[in-house]
Every structure is written in C-alpha cells, then in structure tokens.
A protein has these predicted regions:
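Signature of N6-adenine DNA methyltransferases within the class I
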Residues: 1-17, 21, 84-89, 142, ...
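Class I S-adenosyl-L-methionine
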Residues: 1-194, 200-211, 254, 259, ...
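Active-site-adjacent bridging/hinge elements
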Residues: 59-75, 147, 184-192, 244-246, ...
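Generic, well-ordered alpha-helical scaffold segments in large soluble proteins
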Residues: 65, 69, 92-100, 125, ...
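The start of beta-strands in P-loop NTPase/AAA+ ATPase cores
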Residues: 155, 198, 248-249, 266-267, ...
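Extended charged low-complexity segments that act as oligomerization/scaffolding linkers
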Residues: 211, 246-249
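Polybasic, glycine- and aromatic-enriched phosphate-binding surface used to engage nucleic acids
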Residues: 321, 328-331, 374-376, 385, ...
Length: 655
C-alpha cells in the first residue's frame, strides 16, 4: 500500500509551486480523461513531470495525496509527512460494513396463479398462494422505501465528518453501481439520486469540499451514472442536477465546534479523522498560539443544557478521539460508526474515558488492528486501527481482529477469512482491565495466544507494584516510578562520548541495557572493560554537568524499547555513582523496603538484583507486551504492573 513515487511530488512542486493549482489541474485532467476514456497521463499539462506507472492507475490516490500535502503545509507541518487513506483500504471497510445489508432486485411481475384456470377445489389454495407472493413482494419493496437505506443496501444518510477529497464517497458509489446492475435504468437513476441526497459530507477546508464534489462527479461518470456534459436521460443524472444536490450534501463546516448542518441523523458514519494533537495545529500561522488556545477553549465549551460537549476530553487532546465521540453523538439509535484511528487507542491511558463510552454506553462490535510494520499509510510509523461501533446499548462481546497483515485486506469482503480473531467477552474483559476496557496486543501464533491469555488471567487479580501494603511494601508508603534525572535534549552539551582512558560520571541511557539469555545487565565503559572504541555504548556515555549521582544503587528499567525485540521489560541494577537519562525509569523504594531487602539478601545490591530477576520474569513480560500502548515503557505501565510473590510467578511459569 505504500507508494514508491514520492519523488514525483517533489518534481511537481518544482514545476508548479501553487498547491491549489496542482489540485485544480489534476481534477480537470482527470475529468477530461474520464470523459474520453483515456489515461490521465494523456491530459496532463506538458510541463508536468512524467507520471510514474505506480500513480497512473489510481488518479484518486494522487488527488488524496495532493490535498493532504496542501493541508499539511497550510497547517505548518511538513508536506513530506502527509498521508492519505488508500482507496482499497477504504473500499474494504465499506464492503465489510455493507456485506450483510440487503440489496433489492429489479421489480418483476409476481409469479401468481390464475384462479379461473383451476378447478374449484384448488382455488382456495391458489388464492392463499397469491396472497403470500404479494406479501413477500411488499416486504422486499420496503427495503428502500423506509428511508433508512437505498435499494442497493446502503444505509442513509451516509456521513463523513472529515471528508477530505471524498475517498469514502467515491468508493461507496462504486459499490452502489455494482449492486445496481440488475436494476432497470430508471430504477438505477432513482436509487442513485436517493444515495446522493442521503450524503452528509463535511470538512472545515473549502478546498477539500471542492475536491470532494468534483471527485464524486467523476466517480459517478466512471460508473456511467451521470452525464457530465448534458441534462441526463434514461439511467443518467444530469450534471447540473447532481451539482445542485452536492451543494447541499457536501458542505464546509467544523464537525467538532459547529452544529451538524443536517436535521436527519446518519445511519452510517465512516471517516478517517486527522491524527493531530491540538498543540500541533496552526504551527505555521503567525497567531498559532492564540488560535490553539481558542480551539482548546471552544472544544471545552458546554452545550446549551450545561453538559460538556465532549465527555472524554482530557489533557493534551488528540483530535481523532473527539471525532470518534462526535461520530457516536451524530448517528441515530442503532446507527453505525466505522473510523480509522491509531491503534494506541486500544491501550493508552488517555483513551480510557473514550473506551468506557464505547463499551458501557454503546456496542463496540469490532476492531481491526494493523501493527506499525504493516505501513498502511506511507511514512506513518504508527499502528492502524479500524473501529466498528453500533450506537446505544452496551457491549457484551467485541471481536478483535489482529495483528493483521496488509495482504489480508480484501476490497470485496473486508478481511480474509484467515485473519486471526479474538473475542473480548465483557465479564473476563472487565476483570482483566479493572474496567478500563483496554484490548491486549495478541500474537498471531495460536500457542503464543494461549500463553498470553493464561498470563493475563492469572495476573489480573494480583496486587499492583505501586499499591500500598503489597507483599514487598507493608509500610503503607507507595513505591514510586521516576524518570531518569537527565533530560537528554536540554542537557545535550553536558553529555559526551566515553573515550578509552576516560574518567568521570557514567551517563546511563537505554542503549546500555544488554540482554543475554534471561540475564539483563548494564554494559557501560565505566564498568565493563574491553569495549571497542566505536561501540555504541561509548557514544553519549559521559556526564559532565552539575547534577550529581544519587549515591545509592537503583533498580532501573529501559523506557524506550524496540517493538521488534522479543523482550519488553528490561530491569537492571545501576551503580550508585552514575546518573540516568530520561530514556530510563527507576523505582523509588521506601527506606523500610530498602532496609528489608538488604537484611534478607545480605546487601542492598543483592536485594535489588533479586528483585530485578523477579521483575524480569517471562510471565510479567508477557503481561507487559500484551498491554503495551506503544514503544514507551511509561510510569503508568510500571505502576500498574502485577506484583505477585516470586513463588507465585514460578508456579505460573510451570503451568
């Protein structure tokens, strides 16, 4: 799904620096190519760079990317980091959502029996048969006449509150056209008008709205549903009629701060909202700081009845969370929401209020989880999640699909039948997560899945590391998790390389944690001799600043881990004469605990090493990997780490 033609966009910028003009020219060329049934390369301006084969076959993907680049630059972000939703991915989501809906067939005369042609004794039976046929036909006719869906089986109104260049609308038209093949020309035209009038497309960018409207027209033309140059006719809508409809159904507006411009509630809402924090907005604007403050203030406003507009708004807000809550507000009862968001939503602490809303006040039906190495979006290193929610009620079971591979995406059916699944059943789910409704990260292998489930089930009821009065810490004083005292960015000038023969204070960072088998240790040139001069452990390993060592050994954990490593938790004892970077966390143990482990094991060092072995156990690492939100082993994760007695850990490992 990752395009290899990024160089073409850079060459285009040199030929045409105006990004809005790029979009207008592309749309004009695409429409002309559609009109004449020729490749778009034949209609592009001569001075534009030659279109690579990878982009030639999908003009919509180019439009999406051009718009994403324009919006990124206007917001002060780098256009290189812009990305768009792949069309096949969008179609797979729509196909999965619509695969269980009914599509009506063309109306044909009923197969009724003639009463006059039958003997009197059979007429009562024939009359009942004809009545049954009529009732069946009436039931079928109601499929599209209740106003809740088109005859092609698409729920309406169909909404997208962040429509962009209209990728979902365009793919929906394609699905609609395929389902209308058995209709008569007039039936197809009537149903297409119902679909267009049922659109509710919104975006806060006027440029995006213009692109979406044009793209929808082109999509209709490619499916032979519109006359681009005339008034229409049998089976085709006229262009002016379609444009008039789209003026009402594809509008500019802010779904988060403004009112929804349509009265009827959507039956289906599908969207890929922006993955941006408020603090990342308006970076290129001279009044960016004030604009961010105003945006934050408006989002925190209350409704007319005094309720908060967004009940899940917490801290430094990412906009995708607000779009997801807004989507659940907008759709009608039993309406559906499908949304593409980062897969960190499944486990991160800041999304707990949102997950509670999804589970306790709605039916969270499904989640598709793609790990970051699948690269659904070009240039984006985050994992991708597709959420499926039905409004109202509460969740009994949520089916989690994943970890998924890109080759398991099928535009016709959604996901391949071979995709791994796991059912999150409410009772055990609540017990596992203390009601915060996180979803564990599962491996694909069935044996490894069973190990994860066993570890979670056994550890869920154990006391937490930071809980007061646990078996290690009966004093009532909590065990604290702290970040290393040296911020590597702010103190970069005081951190130097450790050259052979150097003396000074050791600076410990994540790269100094070493794993050999089951043993975790600190490998630093201050404590380990024989390291090569160019070894990575010598780089940024010496501290020359004013902050002094703590003067006592500490139990530390690597905070930033490689997602590809088999082990996530890496605990080791660091010496008393070093300082720690902020890529390392450490435990701040109460004095009574330090004295106790020193007494029981002969010294503080030996006691901490004993505790490190316990915290490095395979069972605890399985737990940690299952609930990891990202590559950062943060304070919240460590504080909530189950903390059973060592003999309990050993018994779990032997099961």
């Amino acid at each position: 799904m990752v395009s290899d033609a990024s160089g073409w966009y850079a060459r285009l910028d040199r030929e045409c620096a105006d990004r809005v003009q790029q979009l207008e020219t592309w749309l004009d060329s695409w429409e002309e190519a559609t009109r004449h049934g020729i490749p778009i390369a034949a209609t592009l301006p001569n001075h534009w760079p030659t279109l690579p084969a990878g982009l030639l076959s999908d003009p919509g993907a180019v439009l999406d990317h051009l718009l994403a680049r324009n919006e990124a630059e206007s917001d002060g972000r780098s256009p290189r980091g812009a990305y768009a939703t792949p069309a096949k991915f969008a179609e797979a989501i729509l196909s999965d959502e619509l695969k269980d809906t009914k599509e009506e067939v063309s109306k044909e005369p009923s197969a009724a029996l003639s009463l006059s042609a039958l003997p009197p004794g059979f007429r009562a039976y024939a009359q009942q048969f004809n009545q049954d046929v009529t009732e069946d036909n009436n039931n079928d006719t109601n499929i599209g006449e209740d106003g809740l869906q088109t005859r092609s089986g698409i729920a309406i109104p169909f909404a997208d509150p962040s429509v962009g260049a209209g990728v979902f609308a365009a793919r929906l038209i394609r699905i609609h056209a395929d389902r209308c093949e058995k209709f008569t020309s007039e039936e197809r035209k009537k149903d297409t008008l119902a679909l267009l009038n049922g659109f509710q497309m919104l975006d806060n960018s006027e440029i995006a709205i213009k692109c979406a409207r044009r793209r929808i027209l082109i999509a209709l033309s490619r499916c032979d549903l519109i006359d681009l140059d005339g008034k229409g006719g049998i089976g085709k809508i006229g262009r002016k009629e379609a444009e008039k409809i789209l003026e009402n159904t594809v509008q500019s507006g802010d779904a988060l701060r403004g009112e929804w411009p349509w009265d009827e509630k959507p039956g289906l809402l599908v969207c890929r909202p922006p993955w941006l924090r408020i603090k990342d907005r308006f970076r290129g604007h001279p009044d960016g700081s004030e604009l961010r403050k105003e945006l934050s203030r408006q989002l925190r406003n209350t409704n007319k009845d005094g309720s908060r507009r967004f009940s899940t708004l917490r801290g430094n807000v990412n906009l995708y969370r607000l779009f997801l809550e807004r989507g659940m507000q907008l759709v009608r009862k039993d309406g559906r929401v499908r949304m593409i968001v980062p897969d960190s939503l499944l486990r991160e602490k800041s999304s707990i209020p949102l997950r509670k809303l999804m589970v306790e006040k709605n039916r969270w039906n499904s989640s598709w989880s793609f790990p970051e190495n699948q690269r659904i979006f070009p240039g984006v290193s985050q994992g991708v999640l597709v959420i499926g929610i039905t409004k109202g009620g509460e969740t009994d079971t949520m089916t989690s699909y994943g970890p998924l591979h890109t080759n398991e995406i099928t535009p016709q059916n959604g996901l391949a039948n071979s995709a791994p699944t796991f059912d999150m059943i409410r009772k055990s789910w609540s017990s596992w997560t203390d009601g915060n409704w996180s979803v564990p990260r599962m491996p694909r292998d069935e044996y490894d899945r069973r190990r994860i489930v066993r570890a979670i089930s056994e550890l869920a009821e154990q006391p937490k590391l930071s809980e007061e009065n646990n078996w290690l810490n009966p004093t009532g004083k909590p065990i604290r998790v702290r970040v290393g005292e040296i911020d590597q960015t702010n103190w970069s000038e005081e951190i130097t390389d450790w050259k052979p023969g150097s003396r000074g204070t050791a600076f410990i960072r994540g790269t100094h944690f070493s794993t050999k088998g089951d043993d975790i240790s600190i490998v630093h040139p201050a404590y380990v001799s024989g390291l090569k001069e160019d070894s990575v452990q010598r780089s940024q390993a010496k501290w020359t600043g004013s902050i002094r060592p703590k003067g006592k050994p500490r139990l530390a954990c690597q905070a930033i881990v490689n997602a590809q490593l088999e082990r996530r938790l890496r605990w080791a004892v660091v010496p008393s004469d070093c300082v720690l970077g902020n890529s390392v966390n450490f435990l701040e143990l109460p004095t009574e605990v330090m004295e106790r482990i020193a007494e029981e094991h002969g010294s503080v060092d030996k006691g901490l090493n004993w505790l490190a072995v316990h915290l490095n156990s395979e069972t605890l690492d399985l737990w940690s990997r299952a609930w990891a939100a990202n590559n950062n082993v943060n304070n919240y994760e460590i504080e909530n780490l189950p903390f059973p007695k060592p003999n309990k850990i050993r018994s779990l490992a032997m099961q």
